[in-house]
């Protein structure tokens, strides 16, 4: 307890420097697309640095159409090799489509490419090392984890944001006025449970109720999970947790009340809003009770099996696409919690894949053209858009993607029957409103990563107790 008290005291002292930033919000853009959640995220980029060649090219590129960028890319990269790096392997699928598009303009165009996907959070180390070269290896990156992007990549001027003109217009903004990161897509991790038993999960607090041990990727191995916990302390999401708590019965409230009371002073010390104590209580119970897994794939494989009676988890929604039906395994063995008519509270967590040029990009025009292609065309986004649970940040591309792949009827069979209702993706608008998806705000995560982050570090994970 002394260690805990001392740590809280240190955190409280640091709030003098950070409290003002912690209240920063996220500016909504027109069209209510995924751009909304990152509008303010890039506001702390190094403002007084001297403009580099890449900066100047980005400034020009932001006023160009995709076709104009494509012509610049052809001049720059014909006969060369393009290196990209990302958290998603699908850049490797998108690049051949991009090259095919450039060939429609110049049939003689040719470009080799290599796409790398570092494991175990090594992408930040790789980009940092590459930034030290006069001319880098990587032209661009597709990267996740808004907190580390903000603090390690943007505040240090390693990565550069390019906003395609067509993307900005689709979102009702201008490339020059938009100050956030550029999201390719929002991915959602959603609460699910095995429905072959008697357990009921009709409130987000049920996932942290007595005896519940949801399957979840460890917060120290996939850090977007830790960002989810940070975001719960933001006022709007803390309020959502309070509203869900209010709808619990007396028995469940009596279980949670001592925990809420126990963290009330911590919430005040951390400078959180009035309902911050509900967020801390939920976080504490989650961290101390979740069952640690290494990847969302095994979590999905467990939950869809009849042997996982009453088990629950928080995992990437799109994993349901890969389930192979058998006697004991079926998508119908799970329920997406938020799809229940009587469900209350947050339905999951939404995080982004962001696109950047490197500060020393060897092929900046080509990088800009590729970024514009995958954010402004349905074909370009198809490497990701072909599957459920990934939503383009461009509302026009989002609409075209749904029209082509019809994810909202993803569970329907050829006879027009809704065979697997859990695979009927209700889409970004539904998830962010009715589904109460918690959306990552990189700036907020960066602001509270020391204060709330250290508080979380003091908690004892269930895996540490075994």
Q: What is each stretch, according to the model?
A:
Residues 17-21:
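C-terminal motif of bacterial Sec signal peptides marking the signal peptidase cleavage site
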Residues 23-26:
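Bacterial signal peptide processing site
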Residues 35-77, 260-263:
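N-terminal low-complexity, Pro/Thr/Ser-rich intrinsically disordered segments
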Residues 42-48, 66-77, 88-110, 323:
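Short, polar/charged alpha-helical segment
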Residues 51-56, 62, 67, 417-466:
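Conserved C-terminal helix/tail region of periplasmic/extracytoplasmic solute-binding proteins
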Residues 80-99, 113-126, 136-298:
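Extracytoplasmic ligand-binding site segments that recognize negatively charged/polar headgroups
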Residues 278, 288-360:
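Extracytoplasmic/periplasmic substrate-binding proteins
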Residues 353-437:
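Mature extracytoplasmic/periplasmic domains
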């Amino acid at each position: 307890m002394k260690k805990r008290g001392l740590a809280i005291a240190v955190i409280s002292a640091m709030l003098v420097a950070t409290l003002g930033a912690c209240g920063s919000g996220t500016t909504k853009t027109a069209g209510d697309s995924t751009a909304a959640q990152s509008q303010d995220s890039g506001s702390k980029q190094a403002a007084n640095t001297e403009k580099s060649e890449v900066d100047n090219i980005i400034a020009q590129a932001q006023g160009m159409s995709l076709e104009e960028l494509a012509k610049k890319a052809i001049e720059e990269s014909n006969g060369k090799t393009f290196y990209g790096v990302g958290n998603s392997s699908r850049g490797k699928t998108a690049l051949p489509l991009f090259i095919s598009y450039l060939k429609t303009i110049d049939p003689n165009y040719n470009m080799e490419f290599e796409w790398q996907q570092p494991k175990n959070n090594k992408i930040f180390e790789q980009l940092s090392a590459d930034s030290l070269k006069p001319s880098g290896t990587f032209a661009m990156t597709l990267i996740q984890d808004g907190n580390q992007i903000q603090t390690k990549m943007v505040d240090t001027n390693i990565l550069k944001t390019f906003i395609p003109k067509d993307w900005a217009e689709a979102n009702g903004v201008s490339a020059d006025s938009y100050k956030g990161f550029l999201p390719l897509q929002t991915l959602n991790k959603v609460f699910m449970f095995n429905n072959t038993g008697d357990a009921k999960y009709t409130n987000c607090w049920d996932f942290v109720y007595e005896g519940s041990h949801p399957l979840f990727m460890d917060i120290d191995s996939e850090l977007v999970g830790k960002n989810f916990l940070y975001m719960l302390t933001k006022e709007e999401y803390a309020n959502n947790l309070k509203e869900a708590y209010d709808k619990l019965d007396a028995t469940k409230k009596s279980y949670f009340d001592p925990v809420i009371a126990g963290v009330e002073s911590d919430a005040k010390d951390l400078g959180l809003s009035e309902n911050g104590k509900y967020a801390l209580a939920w976080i504490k119970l989650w961290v101390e009770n979740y069952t640690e897994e290494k990847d969302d794939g095994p979590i999905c494989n467990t939950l869809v099996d009849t042997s996982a009676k009453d088990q629950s988890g928080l995992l990437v929604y799109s994993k349901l696409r890969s389930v192979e039906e058998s006697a004991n395994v079926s998508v119908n063995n799970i329920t997406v919690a938020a799809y229940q008519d009587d469900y209350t509270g947050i339905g999951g967590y939404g995080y982004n894949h962001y696109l950047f040029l490197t500060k020393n990009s060897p092929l900046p025009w080509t990088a800009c053209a590729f970024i514009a292609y995958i954010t402004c065309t349905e074909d370009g986004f198809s490497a990701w858009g072909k599957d459920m649970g990934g939503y383009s940040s461009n509302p026009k591309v989002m609409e075209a993607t749904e029209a082509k792949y019809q994810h909202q009827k993803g569970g329907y069979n050829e006879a027009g029957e809704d065979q697997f209702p859990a695979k009927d993706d209700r889409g970004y608008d539904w998830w962010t409103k009715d589904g109460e998806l918690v959306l990552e705000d990189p700036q907020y995560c960066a602001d509270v990563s020391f204060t709330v982050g250290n508080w979380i570090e003091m908690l004892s994970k269930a895996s540490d107790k075994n």
